[in-house]
Regions:
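Conserved beta-strand signature within the Rossmann-like core of class I S-adenosyl-L-methionine
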Residues: 156-163
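Short alpha-helix
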Residues: 167-179
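Core SAM-dependent methyltransferase catalytic element
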Residues: 185-202
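A short glycine-rich, Lys/Arg-flanked "PGG" loop and its adjoining helix->strand segment in the class I
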Residues: 143-155
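A short acidic, Gly/Pro-enriched loop at the edge of an enzyme's catalytic core
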Residues: 117-127
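Conserved class I S-adenosyl-L-methionine
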Residues: 2-50
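A short SAM/SAH-binding and catalytic strip from SAM-dependent methyltransferases
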Residues: 125-140
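Class I SAM-dependent methyltransferase SAM/SAH-binding core
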Residues: 56-58, 64-114
Length: 202
């Protein structure tokens, strides 16, 4: 695990290097847990592996582990790598996911910085993200991130993103197809949020 990195969320107004800010922000997200449950459930059901499969998951911009924890609960033999740029968020996530100790680790790096993917080892059955990538706020950079993600997905695996339409979902899905993903579509749509992504064919 890396010990020092620039925050992957440095492209917006959040203060992810502040323990107090991170704790207050996470507490503000807790009431939204029920709202995102439907999206998380669809995302989990879309991962093309049996529940008892010993899959490896990568959560991009994992934050305090809301999605990671949901998936580790749904896939009891899975392990996860939580990528995030905030050391304070990683500390909070490690505390909140204590019951999954030994099944996850944090890697601190900035997915908006070139070469971020080289900080990760191996490939993943599922690469996922939740309300994170839109924070980059640079369409060309988001397109490049999707190209970086593709080699991280193992044959037969998937990339699934629960995020806002910034940039528009149609543009993002076109970038996923250009990166090599197949069967790209929106799997769930809510108010100003959707689960979309694609698969890496065997």
């Amino acid at each position: 695990m890396a010990s020092k990195s620039k925050p992957s969320h440095s492209h917006d107004h959040h203060q992810w290097d502040s323990r107090e800010y991170v704790s207050k922000w996470a507490a503000g997200q807790d009431p939204k847990e029920k709202d995102r449950e439907a999206a998380f459930r669809v995302l989990a059901d879309t991962i093309p592996f049996e529940r008892n499969a010993p899959i490896r998951i990568l959560d991009l911009g994992a934050g305090y582990g809301a999605l990671t924890g949901f998936l580790l609960d749904r896939f009891p033999r899975a392990t996860a790598v939580c990528q995030d740029g905030s050391q304070e968020m990683a500390k909070l996530g490690s505390e909140r996911m204590e019951k999954f100790a030994g099944r996850f680790e944090y890697v601190l790096c900035d997915f908006a910085q070139k070469g971020w993917q080289h900080r990760l080892q191996g490939s993943f059955a599922a690469v996922v993200s939740s309300i994170a990538i839109h924070n980059v706020r640079a369409p060309k950079l988001i397109e490049a991130i999707y190209h970086d993600i593709y080699p991280l997905v193992e044959s037969g695996g998937c990339f699934l993103n629960f995020d806002r339409p910034r940039p528009p979902w149609e543009d993002q899905m076109a970038w996923l197809r250009a990166a090599g993903f197949t069967r790209v579509k929106i799997f769930w749509r809510g108010e100003n949020r959707a689960v979309f992504g694609g698969f890496r064919d065997k």
